[in-house]
């Protein structure tokens, strides 16, 4: 998911440099959403992994 966030950030930067303001804003918005969604999912999985590891051990 972070990979897609980086891809959309690059698309946004290129579109902004070429003068496509609306498309650049949309791409950066998608990149921000994907980045934070990836971080939240990673934290949730980390917490679940730690709690399940305690039950297994």
From Swiss-Prot:
GO annotation, cellular component aspect: plasma membrane
TM annotation in the entry: 4-24, 33-53
Superkingdom per UniProt: Bacteria
Coiled coil: none
Membrane topology: Multi-pass membrane protein
Family matches, as InterPro entries: DUF1328
Keywords associated with the record: Cell membrane, Membrane, Transmembrane, Transmembrane helix
Location within or outside the cell: Cell membrane
Assigned protein family: Belongs to the UPF0391 family.
Protein's recorded name: UPF0391 membrane protein XOO1885
Taxon lineage: Bacteria, Pseudomonadati, Pseudomonadota, Gammaproteobacteria, Lysobacterales
